[in-house]
């Protein structure tokens, strides 16, 4: 009996999570994360040669 209740709850949760949703909020969040990733990548591209140069001076 408990298994049936648990199974029903799992199925309902899966339907809620995997059902069709509007892409508005998740798309905006994804774009913000992508933009932050691009900023980090660009900063790393600018900063790594400088760090390598400083390390070479220390030798």
UniProtKB/Swiss-Prot annotation:
The modification Leucine amide is found at residue 57. It comes from the Eukaryota. GO terms for cellular component: extracellular space. It holds the Pfam family Cecropin. Transmembrane segments: none annotated. It is found in: Secreted. Keywords: Amidation, Antibiotic, Antimicrobial, Immunity, Innate immunity, Secreted, Signal. GO terms for biological process: antibacterial humoral response; defense response to Gram-negative bacterium; defense response to Gram-positive bacterium; innate immune response. Residues 1-23 form the signal peptide. Its main location: secreted. Belongs to the cecropin family. Cecropins have lytic and antibacterial activity against several Gram-positive and Gram-negative bacteria. PANTHER family: CECROPIN-A1-RELATED. This is Cecropin-B2. It comes from Culex pipiens pipiens (Northern house mosquito).
């Amino acid at each position: 009996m408990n298994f049936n209740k648990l199974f029903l709850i799992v199925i309902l949760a899966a339907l809620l999570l995997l059902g069709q949703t509007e892409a508005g909020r998740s798309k905006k969040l994804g774009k913000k994360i992508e933009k932050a990733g691009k900023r980090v990548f660009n900063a790393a591209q600018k900063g790594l040669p400088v760090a390598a140069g400083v390390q070479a001076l220390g030798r």
